[in-house]
Amino acid sequence: MDLVTTTEQTPRAPRRDAAANREALMAAAVRLLNVDAAVPLEAIAAEAGLSRRSVYGHFATRDDLVREVTLRGAARIGVAALPDPVDDPVVQLAALGARLWSEVEHVRVLAQLTVRGPLAAEVGGALAPLRAFLRETVRRGVADGRMRDDIAVDTLARLVEGAALTVLDEATARDLDSAEGHRLVMLAVLAMVGLGWREAYELVRTTPELAVAPPPGPQPPPADPRPAATRPTVTPEPAA
């Protein structure tokens, strides 16, 4: 009688170069989509140092690549933009706006694509922690008498989110610098919850937690995400 043996197949881990190529594509997409939301797939592949054909080993379509980039970015922002807890809900709201700005100001076009583009509904899950934090902050502010109570909390929270996104739109269209965007997003959300412009200005000016963070010190250049074989070779100049 023949003996039949079965061997359980263990899925192979992805090759290191395949994983590196995928990350290179993602990084290239972030850079180029932040300049032009309609950038073609060929340009993204070239930026990553890959052929268009090789892209299809990772993403079946350009839309799939954009979707992956968008959802990953939204998941990061949904967690990273949460500020430290503050007792005063008004200061908390301003800090939330400032923290969100700091997370997206360097990728403004891509951030707009994330929250206003065709994937807005899909990224809702990734942004849920951020929106829940916003709603709770507004609820506390209304309960404490620090924010307007003539609008339902859920509606007011959505209006606050809209005010912050309007600042993002304006900052992108006019290329506002980081400090101005930081200031405007706080003033916009504070105005939406009922603070007068003078009160909001003084709060932002005198609250240390709301100050613009100092620029980071010199950082080493980022690693080139392209495969080593595709990187340009730099030939040293001959000595004089």
Q: Which stretches of residues belong to each language-model region?
A:
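Basic, helix-initiating cap at the start of DNA-binding domains
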Residues: M1-E47, D63-R67
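Short hydrophobic/aromatic patch on the recognition helix
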Residues: G49-F59
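Alpha-helical DNA-contacting segments of helix-turn-helix folds
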Residues: F59, D63-G73
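Short hydrophobic clusters on alpha-helical segments that form packing/core surfaces
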Residues: L25-L32, G73, L100, V104
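Short, hydrophobic secondary-structure boundary micro-motifs
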Residues: L41-E42, L110-V115, R146, D150, ...
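C-terminal peripheral helix-coil segments that are non-catalytic and often amphipathic
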Residues: D2-Q9, E136-A143, D169, A173-A240
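Amphipathic alpha-helical packing segments from all-alpha helical-bundle domains
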Residues: A95, L119-D169
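Hydrophobic alpha-helical connector segments
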Residues: E68, V79-V109, V115-E122, H182
